[in-house]
């Protein structure tokens, strides 16, 4: 009998949500995603020490300014970890722009170009990289410009339908709607403490976005993210991609049985509405308290981990 991970791969592209090279070797995903929190965790792994040392040495050669060296070393470390992961996967690595830039379109564009340049200088072409940006209005506008330059983007921290719609209309390559963090909010802010997978508000959100994209002929890839259990994952089988932590990949690989195909679209494509305006985006996003809370919370948490990473680098400089 097949295991559920093998069965899921027949329906959905499986992506590893980790910076851990050992996990890549074990689960052999198509793609991998990283973020500041995962880079910080990966930096604690002894085998990665040489990647940190190399990033610091390189940063020292780029600038005499200590502050700039810290920024450069963090960028180079994220790319160094990405390069190691790319040796083990056939597809793409997602590398994230500093979350503190999430409300500055031009700064996001500049940072994205810098990360791409570092990958290119290491011999990696753009078609193996996704630049991760927070799904703020400014992040989406940055992605719109980057896509025109041939830099594909992964729009993350996506919690509202307004964010999803704006991303599709901007022509971004991929979105990462969060599942588990949506459920976390409903558990914390409502009387309901348990959700069956089909009733999980995060699952319902991704299903709605997936159906809308397919019904309107958008090419933007839907990659469900931030899972709390395999029930959520199995309920989204058939989604374009799912990015899954090593712990849940392990659980899927140990569970026996075929996975039922849940998401698919065979209907007629409808005409698209006029693009959402900035005012409409903020009004509709603001109407969803969960999305407002989780977007700002996610940006703050990634920013905190970026600052921890910078402190770790500063202590080694």
Swiss-Prot record:
Could you tell me which InterPro entries the record lists for this protein? Aldolase_TIM, TAL/FSA, Transaldolase_1, Transaldolase_AS
Catalytic residues, per the record, are 132 (schiff-base intermediate with substrate)
Q: State the pathway, as annotated in the record.
A: Carbohydrate degradation; pentose phosphate pathway; D-glyceraldehyde 3-phosphate and beta-D-fructose 6-phosphate from D-ribose 5-phosphate and D-xylulose 5-phosphate (non-oxidative stage): step 2/3
Record-annotated membrane-spanning stretches: none
Q: Report the GO molecular function annotations.
A: transaldolase activity
GO cellular component terms listed in the entry, alphabetical order: cytosol
**Localization per record:** Cytoplasm
Query: What EC numbers are recorded for this enzyme?
Result: 2.2.1.2
| Keywords of this entry | Cytoplasm, Pentose shunt, Schiff base, Transferase
The record's similarity note reads: Belongs to the transaldolase family. Type 1 subfamily.
HAMAP family for the chain: Transaldolase_1
UniProt function note: Transaldolase is important for the balance of metabolites in the pentose-phosphate pathway.
Supply the PANTHER family for this chain.
TRANSALDOLASE
Under what name is this protein listed?
Answer: Transaldolase
